[in-house]
Amino acid sequence: MKYYGMYLAALLAILLAGCGESLEDTYKDYSGEGMSIRYTGRPTNITATPGWERVLVEWTNSVDPLISQLKVVWRYDEEADSVLLPAGTTTYSIETINGQPLGDRSFEIILTSVGSDGSESLATTVYGRPYTTQHEEVLAYNRLISTIYKIHDHVVLTFLDWQEGINAAHLTYTKKDGTLGYTELTPELVAQKYYLMEDELDNSKPITVYRTAKLPTCVDEIEFEPMEFDNTRVFNSDFQEDLRRQYGFDEIPEQWIEQQKVLYLDGISYNTLIDLLNFPNLNKVVMGSRRYFPESEADDAEYAQNAVLDPISSNFALEVLNKLNGLTVERYNKHYPQLQAAEFFQEMGATKEPKVKLIDLTGHTFRMSPADIRGFDSHLNHLTDGDPATFWEPRRTNEANQYQLSIDLGEKKAMKGVRIVQRKWENAQEHMVAPTKVRVLLSEDGVNWGYPTYLEETPIGAANGEVCYVDFAATFAARHVMLIVSSGYYFDLNFTSLAEISIY
């Protein structure tokens, strides 16, 4: 009898162990009278994994033998949808809500087991949000192509970075002969940053980029919406501002772009010359021809040499235009030394001042605001004495200042611009206060003023003894001329200086 009891206890332990999962997943409660109430076993280990425009729900089923179905409910605010699945199902892909796409929303997902008598298990709730084109992680991916430049039948691409997770990318386009063109984009090609496509294209048709990616938390491969590139031209802000200085364009006309065969680059500094690729018929670039300073100053890299900050993209643009259009470059002095000189570069040497007719300022002197304090002479008369060795220099102060230099010509006179001569600095460190921008205003009565230039503030060169011509947008008639310059900062002092101001 003792052994029989031991065997019975062991058998009971084995049975209980075998039914362990069922006991965990089958819930019982007791009424006040001790009657047990049995609940349907509920699923466990539920996960909601985001996919591309869907949410994948997975779970582990209860071993409750009375389960006949599984119920999945998903809702967002007042919208709700559901599905009944056969017992034993362990996964479901939620792709729509009431027949409509899920959209970029986070859904409450409720899973229950349904018994053969229609009773439901206790609910388990998880939350899931699909990946869509509006998901912030999807939006964080760039379009791979930064800019497309179209030059006759050719296309130049500039690239952004190949981001982690991108699986594949390619371009489609229409070839010159009307057939469909295809170019695969690879990490190696994109790393080049700049690329002249081999195919000749029909550039009246769009170019489309296709991309796919795989995010670590997404069960699907992401298929981005195809992106079309049209014929819209894109300019960097500094290049566009320089064209506005020269020509007054708020928006650069397409017809004007198409007509340009020669461009003059005199900007003190450009980020890049890649914008030259926007000009399909460009065959000559003239660099630094409108800066005039003594030849002895040409080696001054800080004040006498215009610069380009990204020589790699700039060299690429010049080489492509030389290859496609036979572009030549005329470079004066030693401007843009960062560029790699090529066979199509022509070194032109020093510049010569243009011949202009100066208005006679004999007997006229500039007035300054703020005026000199009593006992101090800034030598305003030096601005019109015709001697570049003399100069005007206001009192040095602890505060930054703007100086208004105005002159009354006595009567209205026709004028096309002002000529400014920079001071020749003996102290190289003081050179940093030389004006690099100027505002010019004209008036007929000395009360109402207007800008005759395309820009309110025009950049000027600051080399030792440099002669700067500020051309007006047209010929104006005025009696009063005003120039506004700002002080520079030298150690603890603020001041500036000029040698000559003339009007032509």
Where are these regions (language model features)?
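Trp- and acidic/polar-enriched beta-sheet ligand-binding modules for extracellular glycan
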Residues: A301-Y303, A400-N401, Q429-Y504
